[in-house]
Amino acid sequence: MSLRRSILALVSVIITTITTPLHAEIPDALFEKLGLERDSAPNVLYDVIVKRYRDVDQGAGEGKFSDLWEPIPFSAYMAPQYFYEAPEELDFDVTRTECVECHQSITPGWVHSWKDSVHGNLDEIRGLDETDSRFYKKEMISEVETNLQSMGVLGDGEHLNVVGCIDCHMGVGAEGGNHQADLMMPDAAACGQCHVQEFAERESERDTLDWPQDQWPAGRPSHALSYLANVETGIWAGMENREIAEGCTMCHTTQNTCNSCHTRHEFSAAEARKPEACSTCHNGVDHNEFENFMLSKHGVIYNTQGDEWDWELPLEQAFEQGGQRGPTCQTCHMESEGEYSHNLVQKVRWGFKPMPAIAENLEHEWFEDRKSAWVSTCSQCHSPSFAESYLDLMDQGTADGVELVSQARVIMDSLYKDGLLTGQTTNRPSPPEPEKDEAGPFFGFFFSKGNNPTAIDVEFAEIWEQHNMKHFKALAHVNPGGFTYSNGWAKLIRSLARIRDTDTTLREKAALLERIRALEEAQ
């Protein structure tokens, strides 16, 4: 390289450093936990993050119950970094250009998606003017090139011509390779090589969730450690029906890949900004966020007017320039203190399961600070007093639900302790390892043998794992029917009534049997 090119490259780096706040949206906590300075070079930041990302002692791998289960063929696509191996029939060499030429006929859907992506149209993006909503992506391409130059993948001043199949599936800049030996299914670290900023933001979820009273393990619940949460759930590891288990995995892949939100092979940011992008996982009996959002006034605004909004603009411009007049999952959960990032847990307060240990500590500074952050978020559309009053309503309503669960738990634990559950002393087989038997267990949704679980076990499990979650989620997403009597409170009351009835029935039966035994012994 000439001296002139070296000087120009250095000047460019200096100017960028002066005019652009480095890693502005990455929380301080990540740098503190990893022992890095905020102005660390992209290659340094990436290497340190990847080292932790792939460390089995810090959440990577198959989990502490790995000896209890074996992957099935589909597992290779859920956790490709652990299980994917290319088929033997792919043992031949390919070049960069041959990828598209061949797959145009074999898997045209892939190619069509890629041709519509930014990856396939870098020069088009570079030619945009400021009136185009995608103009900001020009800077992103430059940032990616700076990252790759820092890593030595690109030379100083060298530009990307296109991001093709081979760049993601064999290595950035590769011109050819063996279709079997060199082929990989990209994990999040592969995306992070180019998208260091976004990768770091997502990984910072581990660092911004330190629960003050240890209500949850550090860094959880989060997208960054979602696969760990999955494989270290006892019944997931212990159940024989691996195909059903992989259904759980399908919503726990965000730790492994980025395409849960940015679907391949277009990886559209506009698609990922819409609530439907979240809906595949954030729905159902224990986390029905999507349904509650859609039934809220926020969702009504989105449903009736969202097709008029400009989804190509970055989130921070959605309200002022994009015509957006109601929040989405993304504008609420990706925002913190006015900045938007791929860390979605910086304002988490109730976690993924309301519990007494949270309800009893909401006045702690940690929770209060996060509540203030929510008031700030809501105040983009509401007055601060309105926002605070609703958050107070949500907190108290959620705590009320927690109290009903606690009442049910006392009854169920007492029945279990006294051995009075149906068949408990005669027909209650142990659950699969590593699960331990208890009243109303989570494993009761995935295992049934003899009288384990009993009908009332399932009823109690529905209270704490489903009804209470729906109650909280409806409160949090402002769907009134969802926390009053369509779901939530009314179903909590109904199940609690059934548990109380069953408690009375079982205890009266036990007392009657005891009287019969006494009479028989007296004869």
Positions of the model-derived regions?
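Sequence context of c-type cytochrome heme-c attachment sites
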Residues: 24-273, 287-324, 341-369
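Cysteine-rich micro-motifs
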Residues: 189-191, 278, 379
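Long, charged, low-complexity terminal extensions
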Residues: 26-73, 78-79, 106, 345-362, ...
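A conserved mid-domain beta-alpha-beta active-site/ligand-binding segment of alpha/beta enzyme cores
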Residues: 329
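Glycine-/alanine-rich, low-charge beta-solenoid repeats
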Residues: 261, 278-281, 332
